[in-house]
């Protein structure tokens, strides 16, 4: 997804994080690594990463859910947070998931 200030209606997600670590936060398949909070990322990118992880079990997140995750952000701000996660190798554009998809990677 290009940073054009617009978001796809549905962003497809693929989990490539590997096994759930012992210190994971969350329940069942809906978990994230707490180390996200100590990374040198914007607050929006940190919150978005945790939010995306909570939707991995569904394999997708809808635009309305992205907006709810980052309530005070514009669509352009959400797109910028997605790009920040790509730059920091926490998200990988997933061509097999479609033009609006990402593979979510583990921290470290």
Question: Where is each model-derived feature located?
Answer:
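Winged helix-turn-helix DNA-binding recognition segment
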Residues: 52-108
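Short recognition helix of helix-turn-helix/winged-helix DNA-binding domains
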Residues: 1-65
């Amino acid at each position: 997804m290009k940073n054009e200030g617009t978001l796809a209606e549905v962003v497809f997600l693929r989990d490539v994080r590997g096994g759930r670590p012992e210190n994971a936060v969350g329940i069942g398949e809906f978990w994230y690594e707490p180390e996200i909070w100590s990374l040198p990322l914007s607050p929006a990118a940190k919150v978005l990463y945790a939010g995306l992880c909570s939707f991995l079990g569904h394999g997708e997140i809808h635009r309305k859910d992205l907006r709810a995750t980052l309530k005070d952000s514009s669509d352009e701000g959400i797109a910028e947070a997605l790009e920040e996660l790509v730059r920091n190798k926490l998200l990988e554009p997933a061509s097999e998931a479609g033009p609006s998809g990402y593979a979510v990677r583990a921290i470290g």
